[in-house]
Every structure is written in C-alpha cells, then in structure tokens.
C-alpha cells in the first residue's frame, strides 16, 4: 500500500466500519511513519476492493484492520488476504492475533477456518459497550 491508495482505503474503511472507522490521518501515519506497520491492498479493475494491515513487533504479528468491499464479500477474498498476511509474517513471527466484534460470527468463522482460536475478550474495545473477541493463531508448528 502506498500513500496514493489511502483515499480509496479510507472510503472502504468507512463503508465497512461506520462510526468505528479509522481517520484518513491514521492511515497516512501508519504507512508513512509507523515502522511496525505493513499494509497491503487487493485490486480489481484498478480499484481497491480490499486491504489488510499488520503490525510486526518482535515475534508477534497483529492484524490491525482488514476489509473487503461489500460487493466482493462471500467469495473468499478476505480469507485470501489473511492467508497472504500469514504467509508474509510466518518467517518473522511465531504468532498472529486480531480483535473481532463478538457479534461478527461470519468473520469469526473465517478466522477459525484459518486456525485462529479464542484468546480472550476486550471489554468496550469498540466503544458504546461493544466488546471484542481476541483470536490468535500459531504461525509455525
């Protein structure tokens, strides 16, 4: 992902996450100033239809955000992005973790199919009393 991608990624972020979306400045900071951050986009017909963000800190990978444009959901593209992130980080990291809304059962199912397991709950993670489930996977067996 490069700085030119940020406006499209930001639009997709708002479409996907509404009130809890990141600001456009947060995305610019991530790709231009955060040395832990690695971001990738998925394109179709010269449009960004998905993206994923990862922080790599020592031997731990953290999925910071992942989204697929609404019209392209249900085709396995989110799983493809996650597999790419897992492959990208497996030589550098032992484990990968993420947070997901406790009521987002579709995403939880995708993560479980990739080997992620329940790791705990973060109370009020998304604000407004909305909790997050922490999930993690071991990258190297």
Show the residue positions of the predicted features.
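Conserved acyl-donor/pantetheine-binding loop and adjacent beta-alpha core of acyl/acetyltransferases
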Residues: 25, 73, 125-129
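Acetyl-CoA-dependent GNAT
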Residues: 4-6, 10-71, 82-84, 88, ...
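C-terminal "cap" of GNAT-fold acetyltransferases
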Residues: 39, 101-105, 114, 124-141
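Conserved glycine-rich acetyl-CoA-binding loop
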Residues: 47, 65, 69-83, 95, ...
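Conserved GNAT acetyl-CoA-binding A-motif
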Residues: 89-99, 122
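A secondary-structure capping/hinge motif
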Residues: 118-120
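Methionine-biased hydrophobic packing positions in alpha-helices, especially
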Residues: 1, 86, 96, 116, ...
């Amino acid at each position: 992902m490069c700085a030119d991608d940020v406006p499209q990624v930001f639009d997709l972020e708002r479409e996907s996450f509404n009130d809890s979306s990141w600001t456009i400045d947060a995305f610019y900071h991530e790709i231009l100033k955060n040395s832990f951050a690695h971001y990738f986009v998925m394109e179709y017909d010269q449009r960004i239809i998905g993206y994923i963000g990862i922080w790599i800190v020592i031997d731990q990978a953290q999925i910071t955000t992942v989204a697929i444009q609404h019209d392209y959901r249900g085709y396995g593209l989110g799983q493809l992005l996650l597999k790419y992130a897992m492959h990208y980080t497996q030589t550098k990291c032992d484990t990968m973790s993420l947070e997901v809304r406790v009521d987002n059962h579709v995403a939880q199912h995708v993560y479980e199919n990739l080997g992620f397991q329940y790791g705990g709950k973060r109370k009020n993670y998304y604000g407004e009393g909305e909790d997050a489930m922490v999930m993690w996977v071991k990258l190297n067996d």
